[in-house]
């Protein structure tokens, strides 16, 4: 089951000020990257269901995903990377594992993925209830358990799931573990910091994906659609820009126009 209106609702919340995008530690922070520096990365989030396998079925909701993604983007703002929600999919796991601790190997986890929701032009993030580690990154998909727990460190994030998700995305962007306790790539801690070398590496890796776009390029496309009076299509692109945690004229315009398109759509007579 997909949530087609969920992404536009995210943009509307951002425009109203109800969606709070904070830094990893829950505090507003300055950002050395400008709007034009930002790279936008699509992620499809999968909430896996398995009524006969409690170890698999996640209990996360769309409201949880709004919060989690906001905190993830607070972490990744230090690298000028923004993960936008391509879609949120709630779906039955393909091969539910009856083990009480959940699947623990590569085949067991990858076997949970329904084939109809896979695609090659984005990152895929799957949430389950239990597995032997907090999270794991495969070339095909990332898995995170919604019961993750971490060791607190000074200045660390205030919630495990956004940190584990951000850590695994770090692996997807080419980063190895680095056992500095306050670093995002340290194992099992709440740390979120990246050094300059890691920031450069993740940005270089992201640029290598054909499906990663610069904020300026996406804004140009959205504006062209808006001028052509293709408001729903424009709103889809504006919604990706509207949640960038940055005080910038372009972000404010994206919020305004995404919200405008949603209001126009809701006021249109039913077809």
Segments (PLM) and residue ranges:
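Propeptide-to-catalytic entry region of secreted or membrane-anchored zinc metalloproteases
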Residues: 27-120, 131, 238, 245-246
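Active-site-proximal segment of zinc-dependent metalloprotease catalytic domains
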Residues: 33-35, 112-178
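N-terminal secretory signal peptides that target proteins for export/translocation
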Residues: 1-7
């Amino acid at each position: 089951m997909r949530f087609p209106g969920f992404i536009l609702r995210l943009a509307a919340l951002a425009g109203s000020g109800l969606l709070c995008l904070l830094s990893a530690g829950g505090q507003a922070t300055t950002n050395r990257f400008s709007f034009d520096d930002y790279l936008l990365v699509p992620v499809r989030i999968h909430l896996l269901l398995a009524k006969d396998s409690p170890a698999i079925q996640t209990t996360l909701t769309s409201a949880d995903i709004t919060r989690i993604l906001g905190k993830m983007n607070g972490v990744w703002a230090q690298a000028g990377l923004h993960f936008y929600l391509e879609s949120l999919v709630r779906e039955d796991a393909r091969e539910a594992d009856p083990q009480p601790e959940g699947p623990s190997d590569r085949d067991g986890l990858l076997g949970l993925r329904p084939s109809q929701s896979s695609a090659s032009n984005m990152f895929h993030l799957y949430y389950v209830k239990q597995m032997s580690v907090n999270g794991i990154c495969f070339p095909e998909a990332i898995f995170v358990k919604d019961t993750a727990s971490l060791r607190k460190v000074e200045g660390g994030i205030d919630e495990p799931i956004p940190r584990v998700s951000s850590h695994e995305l770090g692996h997807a962007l080419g980063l190895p573990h680095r056992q500095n306790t306050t670093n995002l790539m340290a194992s099992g801690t709440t740390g979120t910091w990246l050094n300059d070398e890691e920031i450069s590496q993740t940005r270089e890796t992201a640029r290598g994906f054909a499906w990663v776009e610069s904020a300026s390029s996406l804004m140009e496309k959205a504006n062209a659609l808006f001028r052509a009076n293709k408001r729903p299509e424009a709103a889809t692109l504006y919604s990706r820009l509207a949640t960038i945690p940055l005080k910038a004229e372009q972000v404010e315009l994206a919020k305004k126009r995404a919200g405008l398109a949603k209001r126009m759509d809701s006021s249109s007579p039913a077809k």
